[in-house]
């Protein structure tokens, strides 16, 4: 999974995805996904640059945070050794962080009930400085439970 939801940078697209997931779920089925948190986008990725230097590749990872939308524009530049020279390739994409409340509301609107939200690799609620949250939602056996 690894933050696929964050790659949808518009709420309407996330809502549409949740609606489609719900449409094809059997009653009682679970939907589990993870997201990068607001904390990670604001405090870890933010307007930071990271450099990774290995034997195979040299990578420069640059982030630009829009604080109004919590969107991070990510640019990855890879330099891969090819004999005596390096070949450069680049990737550009954006991610958006959504609040827990926003995601829970969208899941409920899609007819799903939120069973739990966990911190990354735990079965405990996410801490304030948690970088990844895991959501567990279910399509109810009785749709009236979510207000459909």
Model-derived regions: residue spans:
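SAM-dependent methyltransferase
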Residues: 11, 32-106
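A short glycine-rich, Lys/Arg-flanked "PGG" loop and its adjoining helix->strand segment in the class I
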Residues: 14-30
């Amino acid at each position: 999974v690894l933050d696929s939801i964050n790659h949808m940078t518009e709420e309407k697209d996330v809502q549409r995805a949740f609606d489609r997931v719900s449409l094809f779920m059997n009653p009682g089925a679970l939907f589990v996904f993870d997201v990068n948190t607001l904390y990670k986008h604001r405090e870890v990725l933010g307007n930071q640059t990271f450099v990774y230097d290995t034997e195979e590749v040299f990578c420069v990872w640059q982030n630009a945070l829009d604080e109004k939308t919590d969107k991070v524009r990510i640019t990855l530049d890879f330099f891969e050794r090819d004999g005596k020279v390096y070949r450069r390739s680049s990737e550009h994409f954006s991610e958006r962080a959504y609040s827990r409340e926003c995601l829970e509301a969208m899941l409920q609107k899609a007819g799903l009930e939120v069973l739990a939200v966990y911190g990354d690799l735990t079965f405990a609620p996410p801490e304030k400085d948690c970088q990844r949250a895991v959501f567990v939602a279910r399509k109810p056996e009785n749709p009236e439970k979510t207000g459909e």
